[in-house]
Amino acid sequence: MSARKSFCVKTPWLSAMGDVPAHLDYFGGTLYQAVEACARNYPDHTAYVFMGKRTSYRAMLQEINICARALKSIGVRPGDRVTVALPNCPQAVTVFYAINLVGAIANMIHPLSSEKEIEFYLKESGSLFAVTLDQFYHKFEAIRQNVNLDNIILASIKDALSQPIKAGYMLTEGRKLQKIPKDAPILRWNEFIRRGRSYHWKYRAEKGADDVAVILYSGGTTGITKGILLTSLNFNALGAQVIATNPMFRPGDKMLAVMPVFHGFGLGISIHTMLMNGGCCILVPRFTADS
């Protein structure tokens, strides 16, 4: 067997990149562990702001761990796919990292997808669980008999709002929501979280940087959209690269998270890059010129 050959790769572009290092050491753990390590350094910094309501890194980690315990309480196991059909809201951040913490895979999809598209995403990923908003429940219920879902968890935007804003929301947007039958086979977010508070068994999975953590979907411009498997290392490397090429960044800096969490830029940069480096995400659930 011949000895491994050494290759000299020319990198002329480095001369134009100033003080950007030619080599970076990437965080060797999971998505959650990267954020957890950062939170230890900045526990009282604001992790994200949603409709004026601030959440610290300390509080965010607590919410993620309770959510992870809730996922275990409903039977989510390492390697399971959990579909997340949410806009940029606190529940999306919480459940995304909780899924990673229990060793499952987050299948991120557009919450405004059609019923047919949702059915495709659920079947393509083999998802057994789904998390979405109450306003999208009827689309999931319409295709439920065609897929293999064990549980649908329904979150609500109002649950993430401060009291004054919640009152205004219920007078405007809240009135537009279709009623969900009381006997609907779903689990409301608040009840889901209560289960997490009551779960006291092991919930942290032993996963590493190279394990698949996320499924995002291609644009489908040349055919049927395809699921793209991404590891924790993919996101952690991106987070390190973005900061290395933006030396003006400082912990506490804010980013307007307009790009959605089912999009590579939105999830990888607006959310994970900021949260693994002490930044603050301004979560925008629906982009308009006014918002």
Task: Indicate residue ranges for each PLM-predicted region.
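AMP-dependent adenylate-forming
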Residues: 8-16, 33-56, 203
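Conserved AMP-binding/adenylate-forming core of the ANL superfamily
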Residues: 25-27, 36, 44-89, 93-97, ...
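Conserved pre-ATP/AMP-binding loop-to-beta segment of ANL
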Residues: 43, 179-217, 224, 247-254
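Conserved AMP-binding A3 loop
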Residues: 56-58, 204, 213-237
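Conserved structural elements of the adenylate-forming
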Residues: 63-66, 194-199, 228-250, 258
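A short helix-loop-beta submotif of the ANL/AMP-binding
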Residues: 68, 81, 87-107, 111-115, ...
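Structural core segment of the AMP-binding/adenylate-forming
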Residues: 74, 101-191
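Conserved AMP-binding/adenylation subdomain of ANL enzymes
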Residues: 236-254, 262-291
